[in-house]
């Protein structure tokens, strides 16, 4: 067993976990992040699509963009722009409603930011310099003698990780499995009101030179449509970038039907979604060169926000739950949730 006891352990290297880690490390504490996958950023995720030997292009199959309304997050976004991490992608998206494609509503023309190299750049930027243990799936959490003990999935040979304080930034259903017993009855009842809907994402490749100048993104507002979102992903890339890609996100109700589907069945779902997309964006969308389908089990949190944007469990040692599901969704909500929890933890440490 490792004898190292960290000041803080964070489960999950999504936006909220990385945001919290940055603020905690800034205060001089020792923080370690445990991430079950190889990548950083959670649903701010990018797939590297191979076009030919030695040529790959990024395609965003998770979070598509982000806005910045809070002043603190606006400052962060300004720094990212200076560093070349992100850029202003769009001032508004078209909507599909009542069988008609509508121009962006001036009322909702906030700047939408994206990343030239893919949305995973956010996780890479936030994770720089941190102590991160990748491919560490936390199977159980115990508290003993004032220390949190995080145990890896039995299939891994990783030693437990120990810390005096714990932040869990995993999707809420997974967080509940790990530390739900540490929460009060009121907190458990509150979390039961938050749902995390799934999403089927389709990445479709089209012939080089294909252009889609009319729209960057389309928000689908038809209640019975299997589609919730369509993006011309190539509009995020440099003009001379190879490849031509669209991304389709399915609505939660449609996606729920495919949670247990095989790879072959998922491709069928992707083909169905492209047929629907063609009715909105044009028949050309139903003639891809290739398509890849990804399944997000926890994609769309819906429900009330937690007071302060996070939850603190009523246990002897600090335990926080953070994430966009507790703070209105969106990347900005995730970033602020982690920041708020970190500042609350630091205040409690400072005041004893």
PLM features per residue range, with description:
Residues 25-52:
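Glycine-rich FAD pyrophosphate-binding loop
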Residues 65-69, 101-125, 260-269:
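Short beta-strand to alpha-helix junction loop
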Residues 134-149:
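A conserved short coil-to-beta-strand element within the FAD-binding core of flavoproteins
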Residues 4-6, 156-165:
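Core beta-strand elements of the Rossmann-like FAD/NAD(P) dinucleotide-binding domain
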Residues 2-16:
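Beta1/beta-strand and adjacent pyrophosphate-binding region of the FAD-binding site
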Residues 46-94:
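N-terminal FAD cofactor-binding segment of flavoenzymes
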Residues 39, 48, 242-352:
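Conserved flavin/dinucleotide-binding core of flavoenzymes
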Residues 41, 54-56, 163-217, 280:
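Central helical "cap/lid" subdomain
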């Amino acid at each position: 067993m490792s004898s190292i006891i960290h000041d803080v352990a964070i489960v999950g290297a999504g936006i909220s976990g990385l945001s919290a880690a940055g603020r905690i490390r800034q205060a001089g504490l020792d923080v370690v992040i445990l991430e079950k996958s190889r990548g950083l950023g959670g649903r701010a995720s990018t797939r590297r699509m191979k076009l030919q030997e030695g040529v790959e292009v990024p395609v965003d199959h998770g979070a598509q963009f982000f806005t910045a309304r809070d002043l603190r997050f606006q400052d962060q976004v300004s720094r990212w722009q200076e560093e070349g991490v992100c850029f202003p992608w769009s001032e508004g998206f078209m909507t599909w409603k009542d069988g008609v494609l509508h121009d962006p509503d001036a009322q909702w023309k906030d700047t939408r930011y994206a990343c030239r190299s893919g949305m995973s750049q956010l996780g890479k930027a936030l994770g720089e310099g941190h102590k991160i243990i990748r491919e560490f799936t936390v199977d159980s959490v115990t508290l003993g003698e004032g220390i949190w003990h995080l145990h890896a999935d039995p299939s891994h040979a990783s030693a437990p990780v120990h810390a005096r304080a714990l932040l869990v930034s995993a999707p809420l259903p997974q967080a509940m499995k790990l530390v739900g017993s540490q929460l009060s009855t009121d907190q458990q009842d509150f979390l039961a009101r938050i749902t995390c809907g799934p999403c089927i994402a389709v990445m479709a490749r089209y012939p080089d030179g294909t252009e889609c100048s009319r729209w960057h993104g389309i928000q689908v507002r038809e209640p019975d449509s299997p589609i919730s979102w369509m993006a011309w992903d190539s509009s995020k890339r440099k003009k001379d970038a190879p490849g031509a890609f669209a991304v389709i996100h399915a609505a939660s109700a449609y996606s729920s039907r495919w949670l247990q589907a095989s790879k072959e069945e998922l491709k069928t779902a992707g083909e169905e979604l492209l047929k629907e997309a063609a009715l909105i964006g044009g028949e050309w969308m139903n003639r891809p060169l290739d398509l890849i389908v990804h399944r997000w089990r926890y994609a769309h949190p819906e429900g009330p926000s937690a007071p302060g944007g996070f939850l603190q469990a009523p246990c002897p040692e600090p335990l926080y739950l953070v994430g966009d599901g507790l703070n209105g969704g969106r990347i900005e909500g995730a970033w602020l949730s982690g920041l708020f929890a970190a500042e609350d933890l630091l205040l409690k440490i400072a005041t004893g």
